[in-house]
A protein has these predicted regions:
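C-terminal amphipathic helix plus adjacent low-complexity
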Residues: 2-27, 395-397, 402-501
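N-terminal subdomain of nucleotide-sugar transferases
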Residues: 2-134
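Short N-terminal targeting/anchoring amphipathic segment
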Residues: 7-8, 81-84, 155-173, 337-341
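A short, active-site helix/loop in glycosyltransferases that binds the activated sugar's phosphate group
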Residues: 32, 36-49, 206-230, 304-307
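Conserved catalytic-core segment of nucleotide-activated headgroup transferases in glycan assembly
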Residues: 93-94, 100, 217-312, 316-320
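Conserved active-site histidine-acidic residue motif and adjacent donor-binding/catalytic loop
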Residues: 144-148, 318-330, 344
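Active-site-proximal region of nucleotide-activated glycan assembly enzymes
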Residues: 184-241
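Catalytic binding pocket for nucleotide-activated donors in carbohydrate/polymer assembly enzymes
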Residues: 336, 340-419
């Protein structure tokens, strides 16, 4: 079949990497910037590697060209911290860290850069969360400026502020990547490993990494080159934005309500496991009503979901409620949460726990080491939730659906297990004061090959077009190669099919 392969991805990556190394040697830093952005986008989509020390060296070389290394002060303020943030939203971890640092008495310079918008609807919730803290100063970089100009502006802010510590809360490739190598003089740098399953630049430019689960800690150790003593495990709690509950599209009276959903791609596998489980739950339990909240669904996938829901009576008892801004309030009005599979979502799992809701979770055997369910809840206890055995899954489902007291007991157990805000605050201060992990590390065997195969499976399902993306990246560098040939063959086949039928 004419499909994207791991070999195609590696070939494309290596071509772009060689171009970046050559451009850096020639001093063409704008081309380097463009190439690194493309490399980051490619690898983060398929996640077959997690770091690249040679490209980190390229970033350091460009940083030396951009930043005046003699400007930063030798004297630092031990109570000052700079916090880099690319997102500007409450959905990730900025609020948790910033609030803890502010409550501990640190002065914090909160630097927003590369975020999508200014102080608009997206940023309003995080600004409101931070408003009570007078010791947090917010600086928004001008995103209309060129990247390297923003690098100099951020570097100047750091030099003027003279912090003792810097926290980086960002994605794979941003303006901050060029700032980090230039920072020396005893400033301690921490990277919050938010996208632990993704490739990211800069592992060699920070002193410590802060993963939120054992999965991320294992990858940091095995794939990113961090020493054990550099890994400071920091579990987190979800930031709740209170909103008015807007209700459900159908009545829930007399029903047990199961809520499920998240990013659509997390439900894709060769066996249609997730959707098959939902279908069987509907068939087995007539009193069960399932609400599905979907995010990031393409028109093609929307049509596929619509077709699935139209089968038999599924449409009446398996209802798509779309994206919900009032997600916390949704959890308050349901009985059971079921995580997606083969990949689950940590934030949805935590929303269930803080609202005392029990969780159903299934992982297929071939991809169960990415388990995000127990790992985002196991601070005060070690809950047992997920299974790879269908019989055990439906046994637990039956108990949760038919026994209200059992539901409450299981939900209360999860609430007790998850880290609470005050525990997070205290843990963070102890961690960055000692620079030693306060939570024991438990490295374990990860199914790396299965993870790559799953990302390729998503591509082959039609949700992504990695072959077309690689073709677009390569055609300007090489007139003929295996990726371009495969793309052209696929295009010809599609054209013939349109003509024939």
């Amino acid at each position: 079949m004419v499909e994207l392969s791991l070999q195609d991805l590696r070939y494309t990556y290596n071509v772009l990497k060689e171009e970046a190394l050559e451009a850096c040697g020639k001093g063409d830093y704008l081309l380097v910037d463009s190439l690194l952005a493309n490399i980051s986008a490619l690898v983060c989509q398929y996640n077959w590697r997690y770091a690249d020390s040679e490209l980190d060296d390229v970033i350091a070389a460009v940083s030396t060209h951009i930043c005046p290394l003699d400007k930063c002060p030798a004297k630092l303020n031990p109570k000052r911290i700079v916090f880099f943030d690319k997102f500007g939203t409450t959905y990730v971890l900025a609020v948790q860290y910033l609030a803890a640092l502010a409550k501990a008495g640190y002065e914090v310079l909160y630097v927003l850069c590369d975020h999508n918008q200014g102080i608009t609807a997206q940023l309003t919730p995080i600004i409101e969360h931070l408003r009570p803290y007078r010791n947090i100063t917010i600086v928004q970089m001008d995103n209309t400026k060129a990247r390297f100009e923003k690098v100099r502006d951020i570097y100047r802010h750091i030099c003027e502020y003279a912090p003792a510590k810097i926290f980086v809360h960002t994605s794979s490739y941003t303006t901050f990547n060029y700032v980090l190598p230039a920072i020396g003089g005893g400033i301690t740098k921490y990277y919050i490993d938010l996208g632990d399953h993704n490739f990211w630049f800069g592992a060699g430019h920070v002193d410590y990494v802060l993963p939120y689960r054992q999965f991320g800690a294992t990858i940091d150790y095995e794939k990113r080159g961090f020493k054990r003593e550099q890994i400071l495990l920091m579990p987190y709690y979800p930031c709740v934005v209170k909103r008015e509950f807007v209700g459900f599209p159908v009545s829930t009276e007399g029903k047990v309500v199961l809520f499920t959903g998240g990013d659509y791609y997390k439900t894709i596998d060769k066996d249609n496991t997730y959707w098959t489980l939902l279908r069987e739950l509907v068939v087995r339990y007539p009193n069960l009503l399932i609400f599905y909240a979907a995010k990031n669904i393409s028109p093609k996938e929307q049509e596929r979901l619509k077709t699935f829901l139209a089968e038999r009576d599924y449409a009446e008892r398996l209802v798509n409620i779309g994206f919900r801004a009032d997600i916390n309030e949704v959890f308050q009005h349901i009985d059971i949460f079921m995580g997606t599979c083969p990949m689950s979502g940590g934030l949805m799992t935590q929303y269930a726990a803080i609202n005392h809701k029990p969780i159903l979770q299934f992982y297929p055997d071939w991809l169960n080491t990415n388990n995000e369910t127990e790992q985002v809840l196991d601070y005060n206890a070690q809950p047992s939730i997920s299974t790879s055995d269908r019989s055990s899954f439906f046994t637990e489902a039956g108990k949760l659906i038919n026994d209200e007291e059992y539901r409450k007991k299981r939900g209360d157990e999860l609430y007790k297990a998850i880290i609470k805000p005050e525990e997070f605050d205290e843990l963070l201060v102890r961690t960055i004061t000692s620079n030693e992990t306060q939570v024991p590390l438990r490295f374990y065997s990860i199914q790396y090959n299965a993870l790559v195969e799953w990302w390729l499976m998503i591509d082959h399902s039609g949700m992504l077009d990695g072959l077309g993306y690689c073709y677009g990246l390569l055609k300007k560098y090489h007139s003929l190669n295996r990726v371009i040939l495969k793309y052209q063959i696929r295009r010809a086949i599609r054209k013939i099919r349109r003509i024939v039928g």
